[in-house]
Amino acid sequence: MKKVYHYIIHYVRTYLLLELLAGLWLTVKYFFRKKITVQFPEEQTPLSPRFRGLLALRRYPNGEERCIACKLCEAVCPALAITIESEQRDDGSRRTTRYDIDMFKCINCGLCEESCPVDSIVVTPIHHYHISERGQNIMTKEKLLAVGDLMESQLAADRAADEKYR
């Protein structure tokens, strides 16, 4: 009897195409609902203050760059995307002469930001950037500082909003 029942169920599923009808029902159900597609260039979805986008270097309020060339970000980077060269200043402090980030290698993990003792390198909410020529994938120190100067007010606001979670 059990074998006959199994055959009956098999033939009902096969000839009535229950899987196909279930798929069609799902399609019909979603066909008449409101669309949730975002038209990307014209519409923007809200970003979290913790969003990890393009990297930037920050400055102190007096205009001096924050990076002290400790090279912790270079050491902690799992993708080996950061290259730092430094030299001693006359006053005995170290400063960077070269700070490059290869954006093809960068995986936007945020470990460089977490390891920085002076909050020099930060991630910004910028997520639309493109590369149209060879060599533009290397973010030099000047480019990183320019992005940091451009985004400083928003970075401060995002850090203030996120402070209780740090």
Curated annotation (Swiss-Prot):
Its EC number is 7.1.1.-. Its main location: membrane. [4Fe-4S] cluster 1 binds at residues 67, 70, 73, 116. GO terms for molecular function: 4 iron, 4 sulfur cluster binding; iron ion binding; NADH:ubiquinone reductase (non-electrogenic) activity; quinone binding. It is found in: Cell inner membrane. It is a peripheral membrane protein. One of its GO terms (cellular component) is plasma membrane. [4Fe-4S] cluster 2 binds at residues 77, 106, 109, 112. It comes from the Bacteria. Its cofactor is [4Fe-4S] cluster. The keyword rRNA-binding does not apply. One of its GO terms (biological process) is aerobic respiration. Binds 2 [4Fe-4S] clusters per subunit. It catalyses: a quinone + NADH + 5 H(+)(in) = a quinol + NAD(+) + 4 H(+)(out). InterPro entries: 4Fe4S_Fe-S-bd (IPR017896), 4Fe4S_Fe_S_CS (IPR017900), NADH_quinone_OxRdtase_chainI (IPR010226). Residues 57-87, 97-126 form the 4Fe-4S ferredoxin-type domain. It is an enzyme of class 7 (translocase). Keywords: 4Fe-4S, Cell inner membrane, Cell membrane, Iron, Iron-sulfur, Membrane, Metal-binding, NAD, Quinone, Repeat, Translocase, Ubiquinone. NCBIfam families: NuoI, PRK05888.1-4. NDH-1 is composed of 14 different subunits. Subunits NuoA, H, J, K, L, M, N constitute the membrane sector of the complex. Belongs to the complex I 23 kDa subunit family. NDH-1 shuttles electrons from NADH, via FMN and iron-sulfur (Fe-S) centers, to quinones in the respiratory chain. The immediate electron acceptor for the enzyme in this species is believed to be ubiquinone. Couples the redox reaction to proton translocation (for every two electrons transferred, four hydrogen ions are translocated across the cytoplasmic membrane), and thus conserves the redox energy in a proton gradient. This is NADH-quinone oxidoreductase subunit I. It comes from Legionella pneumophila subsp. pneumophila (strain Philadelphia 1 / ATCC 33152 / DSM 7513).
